Amino acid sequence: MELTPREKDKLLIFTAALLAERRKARGLKLNHPEAVALISAAIMEGARDGKTVAELMSAGRTLLSRADVMEGIAEMIPDIQVEATFPDGSKLVTVHQPIV
């Protein structure tokens, strides 16, 4: 199976997000890479589902709270930018202050 670098990146994000979901479900606080992966994967999947950029920007702020992440992680992530594939092409989605 031949994958492009972008496809490899998407799979890596998805794998990290899956791990983050499992850890969160067990009650563990997420670290920086896990939090970013979880939010990024949700944005990418939402784009594939046909949601708008505005919907994803809003939804991206509801996925994690400060209680879900290790101390100081919320301050380390002022925004997250994801290039997501929508039905009408790729678009950049920016979520400001994703962890409230």
From Swiss-Prot:
It comes from Verminephrobacter eiseniae (strain EF01-2). Pathway: Nitrogen metabolism; urea degradation; CO(2) and NH(3) from urea (urease route): step 1/1. It is found in: Cytoplasm. The keyword Transmembrane does not apply. It holds the Pfam family Urease_gamma. The keyword Protease does not apply. GO terms for cellular component: cytoplasm. GO terms for biological process: urea catabolic process. Gene3D superfamilies: Urease, gamma-like subunit. Disulfide bonds: none annotated. It catalyses: urea + 2 H2O + H(+) = hydrogencarbonate + 2 NH4(+). Its EC number is 3.5.1.5. Keywords: Cytoplasm, Hydrolase. The gene is ureA. One of its GO terms (molecular function) is urease activity. Transmembrane segments: none annotated. Heterotrimer of UreA (gamma), UreB (beta) and UreC (alpha) subunits. Three heterotrimers associate to form the active enzyme. This is Urease subunit gamma. Belongs to the urease gamma subunit family. InterPro entries: Urease_gamma (IPR012010), Urease_gamma/gamma-beta_su (IPR002026), Urease_gamma_sf (IPR036463), Urease_subunit (IPR050069). It is an enzyme of class 3 (hydrolase).
